[in-house]
Amino acid sequence: MTNIGSLLVDAATLMVTGMAVVFIFLTILVYLVRLLSKLVPEEVPEPIAAPKTNTRVQSTSSAVSPQVVAAISAAIHQHRASIAK
C-alpha cells in the first residue's frame, strides 16, 4: 500500500497543475477578448428620431364631465368616511 505522504504530494501536484492550467487558459482568454474588442469596431446604433409630440389639446367633448367628477368625489368621500369609523 502506498504511503499517505506520497498520496498527499500527488494530490497537491495534481491540484497545482490543474489550477495553473485554468489560470493560464483564463489569462489567454482575457487577452484574446481584449484583442478582439480592439480589432472589431463597435457597432454604433443609428440615432432614433424622436417622435413628434402632438401639441394639440384634446377637445373638451372627450373630457370627463363635471357630474362624473362629482359622483367620483362623493364615492371617495363616502368610502373614506366608512373606513374611518
From Swiss-Prot:
Assembly state and interactors? Answer: Heterotrimer of an alpha, a beta and a gamma subunit.
Q: Name one GO molecular function term.
A: sodium ion transmembrane transporter activity
A Pfam cross-reference name: OAD_gamma
Q: What is its EC number?
A: 7.2.4.2
Q: How does it sit in the membrane?
A: Single-pass membrane protein
Q: Which organism is it from?
A: Vibrio parahaemolyticus serotype O3:K6 (strain RIMD 2210633)
Similarity section: Belongs to the OadG family.
Q: Which UniProt keywords apply?
A: Cell membrane, Ion transport, Membrane, Sodium, Sodium transport, Translocase, Transmembrane, Transmembrane helix, Transport
Per UniProt, subcellular location reads as: Cell membrane
Q: What is the protein name stated in its UniProt record?
A: Probable oxaloacetate decarboxylase gamma chain
GO biological process, any? sodium ion export across plasma membrane
From the UniProt record, list the reaction(s) this protein catalyses.
oxaloacetate + 2 Na(+)(in) + H(+) = pyruvate + 2 Na(+)(out) + CO2
Major place of localization?
Answer: membrane
Entry GO CC: plasma membrane
Task: Show the NCBIfam families listed in the entry.
Answer: oadG_fam (TIGR01195), PRK03814.1 (NF003004)
Keyword Ligase included in the entry's annotation: no
Q: What is its biological role?
A: Catalyzes the decarboxylation of oxaloacetate coupled to Na(+) translocation.
User: What sections of the protein cross the membrane?
Assistant: 11-33
Q: What enzyme category does the UniProt record give? A: translocase
Cofactor(s) of this protein: Na(+)
